[in-house]
Amino acid sequence: MIKQFHYDSDMAGGSLMVRESRIVAGLLMDSLTPEQWDEAIRVENVLQKRTPASAKRNATAIRKRLERLEPEFWRALRDGDDELATQVAFCGALERNLLLVEFMETVLRDAYMSRAEHLDAFVWAEFLEDRSHRDPAICDWKESTKKKMGQVVFRMLAEVGYLKSTRKLE
């Protein structure tokens, strides 16, 4: 029996969050127990978030991205300069988000090849519509979720230098 394909993405969880990713990388390097992890994230609030729920949500998203990378990347993220840390956080996001990879391989590549000076905001919606043929569950996602994911993708691309601005999508 053929298994139905589904995108497994955490892009609604936030952009690169480099500062927070550095902290999470350090926690991963410390090999904390689940109890120690919870203590650091929710009680000590090492990510400095307003609520324990926000801290847990961000930490979980970042952890899922970074756990796909080798520990050497965690060290580079934690100890490297801002540019290196941003690149490593982006690598983690790419490893975790096939949708992001495919968006870059198709939409962003086409924009570069055609020397487009900016991206239109609707390209994310069109991209998701195209991908819904591969994963029909995308049609069930809330419009607000799709929009938030697009905002996060454009913010990531700006943070890593592929776009100059998230306002004009240049």
Regions found by a protein language model. Give the residues of each.
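Positively charged, polyanion-binding regions of nucleic-acid-associated proteins
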Residues: 89-91, 95-118
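Catalytic DNA-binding helix-loop module of base-excision-repair DNA glycosylases/AP lyases
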Residues: 106-108, 126-127, 156, 160-161
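Eukaryotic partner-binding/assembly regions in large regulatory complexes
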Residues: 1-88
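Accessory, usually C-terminal, subdomains that scaffold auxiliary metal cofactors
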Residues: 139-170
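Helix-boundary capping/turn motifs
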Residues: 14-17, 32-33, 95-101, 127-131
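DNA-recognition alpha helix
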Residues: 120-136
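Long, low-complexity intrinsically disordered regions
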Residues: 108, 112, 116, 132-141
